[in-house]
Amino acid sequence: MFLMNMLCLIIPILLAMAFLTLVERKILGYMQLRKGPNIVGPYGLLQPIADAIKLFIKEPLRPLTSSKLMFTLAPMLAFSLALSMWIPMPMPHPLIHLNLGVLFILALSSLAVYSILWSGWASNSKYALIGALRAVAQTISYEVTLAIILLSTMMMNGSFTLSTLTTTQEHMWLIFPLWPLAMMWFISTLAETNRAPFDLTEGESELVSGFNVEYAAGPFALFFMAEYTNIIMMKALTTTLFLGALHNPLLPELFTANFVTKTLALTMAFLWIRASYPRFRYDQLMHLLWKSFLPLTLALCMLHVSLPTVSAGIPPHM
């Protein structure tokens, strides 16, 4: 039974990830006044399946000088971590009810750094190593702000359990009282998932394609799948944290439809940003975090910690 539950979680995620690649190519196409994929199947709907078949039947090449074990393990670790992050997500019921679901997600997203580092180091290529070091520095840096924003949000929630956020946001979405945090969270998730305009790790003019430059076929597909699964996961987490889900006692069936609609809208905003903005310079990226986001999030976190203490003695009618 537990295996069935796992499959019922993993298969829709993989389907969503496959069609997200098509949605991205369509959005980029229409924003550049062209059609995007429209040959394979009606309106190009079978394009992700064709891409998957092409990637998985190719021969996975491995550089002669690379470290065999790490080179093979890195993409597998990346993809398994990307799928594991979905375990505590309430949609509307999580796979496992974790008391500290938020910390679990944070810990796994920190572990994902190792897969990037291993792939860059094991490839034995200077481009891959520089790309990996950039990605690791960027991911670790933005983890700090993500953790502080999560801490402030959990102050409003009262616990680290994601399922209780639905009850917290019955009357009002948390995006309204926490809008500065929500904006910084959105930008930090862009940096966390290495997406434009923060895709410094794969600056084509400098690093060919970043840490996965030596990968081909199946292992490359695993990295690609991990990236897109992470994007959907981050947007699903954003929906849970800030946009609440529709909590209608008369129509509880609408929960999932509502959740999916909001997640899709946020994911399309991600893709829209990719089509609209140029890439940042690396020092600007770090300055944005350490000189702007970190002081702001720390100040707001202190505010959210002190407000309940300060207002504890005020009578309710005031």
UniProtKB/Swiss-Prot annotation:
Main location as per UniProt: mitochondrion
Top-level taxonomic group: Eukaryota
Coiled-coil boundaries: none
Gene Ontology MF: a single term: NADH dehydrogenase (ubiquinone) activity
Locations listed in the record: Mitochondrion inner membrane
Gene Ontology terms: biological process: aerobic respiration
EC supergroup of this enzyme: translocase
Membrane disposition: Multi-pass membrane protein
Catalytic activity line of the entry: a ubiquinone + NADH + 5 H(+)(in) = a ubiquinol + NAD(+) + 4 H(+)(out)
Keyword Protein biosynthesis (UniProt): no
Keywords of the record: Electron transport, Membrane, Mitochondrion, Mitochondrion inner membrane, NAD, Respiratory chain, Translocase, Transmembrane, Transmembrane helix, Transport, Ubiquinone
Keyword 4Fe-4S appears in the UniProt entry: no
The enzyme's E.C. designation: 7.1.1.2
InterPro entries xref list: NADH_UbQ_OxRdtase_su1/FPO, NADH_UbQ_OxRdtase_su1_CS
TM spans (from-to): 2-22, 37-57, 69-89, 100-120, 136-156, 171-191, 206-226, 253-273, 294-314
A cellular component term, taken from the record's GO annotations: mitochondrial inner membrane
Record-linked PANTHER family: NADH DEHYDROGENASE SUBUNIT 1, NADH-UBIQUINONE OXIDOREDUCTASE CHAIN 1
Family designation: Belongs to the complex I subunit 1 family.
Record-linked HAMAP family: NDH1_NuoH
Protein name, UniProt field: NADH-ubiquinone oxidoreductase chain 1
Biological classification of the source: Eukaryota, Metazoa, Chordata, Craniata, Vertebrata
Gene that encodes the chain: MT-ND1
